[in-house]
């Protein structure tokens, strides 16, 4: 293998590992951080409303116990 071919292979390996590591840094579901935060806020509001109802809170302590 010539020096030029070795250098080309080196660049291809570096490029491939950079692309793979860059893709792994993003959310796995393909949504951006703002969408993930919005979904998290919606879930928190739903649980908050659910746990504020005494019959739901006492019927599902595994969901609402963290609030005590």
UniProtKB/Swiss-Prot annotation:
Q: Which residues form the propeptide?
A: 22-48
Q: Where, by tissue, is this protein expressed?
A: Expressed by the venom duct.
Recorded GO CC terms: extracellular region; host cell postsynaptic membrane
Spell out the disulfide connections.
51-64
UniProt signal peptide: 1-21
Q: Name one GO molecular function term.
A: toxin activity
- Which compartment or compartments is the protein found in? Secreted
Keyword tags: Acetylcholine receptor inhibiting toxin, Disulfide bond, Ion channel impairing toxin, Neurotoxin, Postsynaptic neurotoxin, Secreted, Signal, Toxin
Tagged with keyword Transmembrane helix? no
Q: Write out the domain note.
A: The cysteine framework is C-C-C.
What function does the entry list? Alpha-conotoxins act on postsynaptic membranes, they bind to the nicotinic acetylcholine receptors (nAChR) and thus inhibit them.
Family recorded in the similarity comment: Belongs to the conotoxin A superfamily.
Full protein name: Putative alpha-conotoxin Qc alphaL-2
